[in-house]
Amino acid sequence: MAKKALIQRELKRQKCVAQFAEKRKALKQAIKEASSLQEKLNLHRKLQQLPRNSSAVRLHNRCRVTGRPKGYFRDFGLSRHVLREMAHDCVLPGVTKSSF
C-alpha cells in the first residue's frame, strides 16, 4: 500500500487541475490565436505563473484501493494485483478468467 501522503498529494493535484482547467485552456487558445510575438510572450508568461500542479501532465494514475502507481488498469481504476483478487472473488461484473 502506498503512503497516505502520496495518495493525498495526488488527490490535491487532481483538484488543482480541475480548478485551473478552464483558465489554462483559455490561455493556450489565446497563445495560438496571438498575432505578435510580444503578445505570445506575455500570454506564455501568464501561463507559467499558474501553479505547476495545475497541469494535467503531472497527474499519475493510482489504484483506488492501494494507491499503487504501477500496473494500473484504466478500465477499472485498479492495479493488477487488486484486479486479479477482485476478479477471483467475482466482485467485478462481467470479468471472467479466460480458459483455452
From Swiss-Prot:
Entry's family note: Belongs to the universal ribosomal protein uS14 family.
Listed PROSITE patterns: RIBOSOMAL_S14
Source species taxonomy: Eukaryota, Viridiplantae, Chlorophyta, Ulvophyceae, Oltmannsiellopsidales
Signal sequence residues: none
Subcellular location: Plastid, Chloroplast
Record note on quaternary structure: Part of the 30S ribosomal subunit.
Listed GO MF terms: rRNA binding; structural constituent of ribosome
Protein name (record): Small ribosomal subunit protein uS14c
UniProt keyword annotations, A-Z: Chloroplast, Plastid, Ribonucleoprotein, Ribosomal protein, RNA-binding, rRNA-binding
Pfam families for this protein: Ribosomal_S14
Protein source organism: Oltmannsiellopsis viridis
